[in-house]
């Protein structure tokens, strides 16, 4: 018997998540992972590495609580937002329970559920990428955790708050509703943060990977009521954050770090507006989808041809052609103006 045959049956059936980095490429313009295009500069202030780190570093918890305008007991810090997804499934799903998500959306909801042996249900978004509440309500039987993303990855739009509140109303007492706000800094007024006190089954995922320009740090957060946070504390690893990670995260959450983040957001929004203006002039562009994030989803006449043409020129975009309902679509992360100018030139020739 082979080693792979000794693995769990559900693991044998899995396909590894195709992250932007896993897909590879030899490009010099990377616009496929929704990262900030340049790195902030930090110096380590904590240099004691022979001791285990704090399970939940106080400076990071208090810093993020102050930034998000919640209490420290409403916050748990994780190894990126992806660990938050996994913890929520681990903490709340029995083997017979199900996870529901709404494609096209972030792929890790399905991957995490399948890895943990939890079945999934899907209720596709509507044609304008909003929640299909009647269909969701029909499919709630057996569902313990629901993942929604706003701004949604890869479409870029925000979900209607009235729909999110309705979703919370119809799931009270039966399921956890998780709103993934990884990109919320680009549309802060649409956050569900003010609803935490009204809905004890609401959890919000946040990250330092996007607007804070710290994707390499792997630092994320779950915001929720203290009882829900307490459940996650039971299933999280004992020492999730390495000392250098918590050191840099705490610095990034200081007032100066938050101010720098807001400057980055302004830069991204300006470059996004410029890119959209240029895309409108390209004949092969069929549709530019409205976006409130640091990327733009674009439908082309022949998306695969365009993607491959830019790949060969060292410009790496994110092919969404196989995603649900996104045939011929490509997601373009907002890079520097120089990177976007090079991309536009290549798109015109593709």
From Swiss-Prot:
Reaction(s) the record says it catalyses: L-histidinol phosphate + 2-oxoglutarate = 3-(imidazol-4-yl)-2-oxopropyl phosphate + L-glutamate
Gene3D superfamilies, A to Z: Aspartate Aminotransferase, domain 1, Type I PLP-dependent aspartate aminotransferase-like (Major domain)
Enzyme class, spelled out: transferase
GO molecular function: histidinol-phosphate transaminase activity; pyridoxal phosphate binding
Pathway linked to the protein: Amino-acid biosynthesis; L-histidine biosynthesis; L-histidine from 5-phospho-alpha-D-ribose 1-diphosphate: step 7/9
Keywords for the protein's UniProt record, in alphabetical order: Amino-acid biosynthesis, Aminotransferase, Histidine biosynthesis, Pyridoxal phosphate, Transferase
Keyword Amino-acid biosynthesis: yes
Gene Ontology BP, a term: L-histidine biosynthetic process
Family to which this protein belongs: Belongs to the class-II pyridoxal-phosphate-dependent aminotransferase family. Histidinol-phosphate aminotransferase subfamily.
PANTHER family: HISTIDINOL-PHOSPHATE AMINOTRANSFERASE (PTHR42885:SF2), HISTIDINOL-PHOSPHATE AMINOTRANSFERASE-RELATED (PTHR42885)
Protein name: Histidinol-phosphate aminotransferase 2
Lineage of source species: Bacteria, Pseudomonadati, Pseudomonadota, Gammaproteobacteria, Pasteurellales
